[in-house]
């Protein structure tokens, strides 16, 4: 095995519960992420050869591998996140399936199975080593595979000084899954020309386009009277919420869109006749389309208020992150390098938009162009999550190839 510590490192990481908490007011949102960084990652970062290793109050563990050849002038960063998604992460018991035979994989004693009939991606991995869940938790390959791959690449480079490279910065951060991890990223002191998040999915993913994203919070104010005498008096706040929703295009919902299509997504609807609340997320790739979606919601609210004779529909819009393509397309060097390295490794680059966001979305707008590399995970965020060890090894190869790349 080229990277003998990769599997054990990954298994150690995923057994630690680092689930983030969107209701928390602290950064990191959970103490477990802080403990994971200080008790496991920081000591290991030092062991694998990183220097100037420290932990910031913003939740990031940072380290540097100095250049070993002055002809490599580019300084490159690699970033992954510690937290896992909103699914049970307590007592993760990963299964290691060696030489996968292409059949159904029972997930422990849970009664759940990984079945190629349900998950066609499994067909790609026959003969490989797969790491799965036991059916009671997620796995945490998103994004502990990325952390393990970066750590393993640094370990390998430290042990092989004949591989020449420039300065490398590493950052492991919190709370990506709840969308706030990069808000306090110290870009000024993460001194690199560009970086990569190692937070993608299957082999070959190379992404530099994300959604632009906003959140919409709506309050609907009704007027409650006895339903027996309600004619021309009652204003049902729940009905206002329904009326608002029905004025949004039915085709512009997540379950009906793909590729570069944007959407409105109703996340939550609660209330009574007197008052109701609705939460939406708004997503699109193009700036004009993104702005038009927000304007359309405001126009619906304004129209309803005009018809109601007073402000009963209160809309608050808040931008969350923007399509990092706006930054990265100004200098495609990180994409050209990653693509060239993958091709040299016989990896077919898969350059597609991310129908979501990464920490790189925000970090790019802080002045560090940060596209996304594959980390290997499949079926992320749930009990059917799995990852191929061979794909993780290829991610390590890619990281090493990027830092040692020079134009011929």
From Swiss-Prot:
> Where do the catalytic residues lie?
83, 176
**Functional summary from the UniProt entry:** Cleaves the N-terminal amino acid of tripeptides.
State the name under which the record lists this protein. Answer: Peptidase T
Species name for this entry? Streptococcus gordonii (strain Challis / ATCC 35105 / BCRC 15272 / CH1 / DL1 / V288)
Query: The organism's lineage?
Result: Bacteria, Bacillati, Bacillota, Bacilli, Lactobacillales
Which NCBIfam families does this entry report, sorted A to Z?
A: peptidase-T, PRK05469.1, PRK13381.1
Q: Which Enzyme Commission number(s) are listed?
A: 3.4.11.4
Keywords annotated in UniProt: Aminopeptidase, Cytoplasm, Hydrolase, Metal-binding, Metalloprotease, Protease, Zinc
What does the record note about the cofactor? Binds 2 Zn(2+) ions per subunit.
* Protein's cellular compartments: Cytoplasm
* Positions that bind Zn(2+) 1: 81, 142, 199
Q: Which Gene3D superfamilies match?
A: 3.30.70.360, Zn peptidases (3.40.630.10)
Q: Which GO terms describe its molecular function?
A: metallopeptidase activity; tripeptide aminopeptidase activity; zinc ion binding
Catalyzed reactions: Release of the N-terminal residue from a tripeptide
Q: Could you say which cofactors this protein requires? A: Zn(2+)
Query: Might you report a single GO cellular component term?
Result: cytosol
InterPro entries referenced in this protein's UniProt entry, alphabetically: ArgE/DapE_CS, Bact_exopeptidase_dim_dom, Peptidase_M20, Peptidase_M20_dimer, Peptidase_M20B
Q: What family is it from?
A: Belongs to the peptidase M20B family.
Supply the HAMAP family for this chain: Aminopeptidase_M20
